[in-house]
Each structure stands twice: as C-alpha cells, then as structure tokens.
Amino acid sequence: GIPVIEDAAQSFGASYKGRKSCNLSSIGCTSFFPSKPLGCYGDGGAIFTSDDAIAQACREIRVHGQSKRYVHTRVGVGGRMDTLQCAIVLAKLERFDWEIAQRLQIGARYNQLLDEIGFKRVIQRTDRTSVYGQFTVLCADREAVQSAFQKAGIPTAVHYPVPLNEQPAYRHLCCPDCTPVSRA
C-alpha cells in the first residue's frame, strides 16, 4: 500500500488512544523549529519509521541522494541538522515530559478561562492528549479579539492565513470545497 505520512510538527509529545504522535502511521515526522513543542534554536526535524526500506530512502535523501559515498542513487537534499541544534534538542528532550506537563496545565487553564468568556475552541476528547503546539479559537470578530488581546499584552497570530488548497503550487490539485472549513 501507500505509506501514510503523519505530520506531527505541532503535536510531538501528544498521544491518540495511548499511542504517541510520530507513531501512528508508516512515517512520522516532526519539526524542531523554535516555535514547535520540542524546538531547537535554529531549524531541524526528525523522521520516524519502522520500515527499513523507507528509513534507508530517508537516509539517502538526507545526504543528497547518496547510497554510498559519491554514488547518488536518487534525488536528494542537504537535510542534516548541525551539531549545535542536535545538542539543544537532546538537552531539551531530557526535560520534555516536564514541559508537556506544564503545557497541559496551562492549556487547562486557558480552556477554563476561554469557556468562561464564551469562546468556541477545540474540544479535547478523552482518548487523546494535546501539547498545545498552537491554541486555536473560533470567534466572530477576529480582528477585534486580536486588538483586545494585544492591548492586554497577550500575543496572538493567524498561523496559516492562506489555506493550502489556495496556495498557487497546490491550487490545481485541491478541492475548492475545503475553503469554507479552513476559513471558519
């Protein structure tokens, strides 16, 4: 079959039905960009798989497509993390469980406060945990809410203002009916 790629860039450390993110499909991937749950100070990421052939292909793609030195068996990229970023991720990984616990505590408080003022938000089901890589809310007047939060010193962002199906590179591939949901 076709391998399923799980994008866990925002959810590294979360779980679904007792299984950790990056472990729910054929290939799991995450980002170590600074704003992510396990972020370094620069850029980086990781791919997880239990399939030996996929793992080998990923290793080759990561080093310009080389299967052995000076032999390029596929098209690849320079996709290696530098040692400083690796050291940062490894150090942060040692306290990652503590950080997740802190995120869960803060997320529960946000949920309580947002419920009190009537915001619509993502409801957390009992068979999964979030690490609150992003905290998404739905409101009638986004600009007014952002302005009020800004005045109170609370940062906000519209993280993906142009939906993927409207991006020029993908517009011809995607379903236009997706847009109303992504804009909600």
Language model feature labels by segment:
Residues 1-2:
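A short helix->loop->beta-strand "cap" motif at the edges of active sites that frequently abuts
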Residues 6-39, 68-73:
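Conserved active-site segment immediately N-terminal to the catalytic lysine
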Residues 9-10, 33, 43, 59-63, ...:
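Histidine-centered beta-alpha loop that forms part of the nucleotide-sugar donor binding/catalytic region
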Residues 15, 50-184:
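PLP-dependent aminotransferase class I/II
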Residues 20-24, 47, 174-177:
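Short, hinge-like loop/turn segments at secondary-structure boundaries
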Residues 22, 31, 45-51:
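Short beta-strand-to-turn element immediately C-terminal to the catalytic PLP-Schiff-base lysine
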Residues 29, 46, 134-136:
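Short aromatic/hydrophobic contact patches that present stacked aromatics
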Residues 40-44, 89:
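Adenylate-forming
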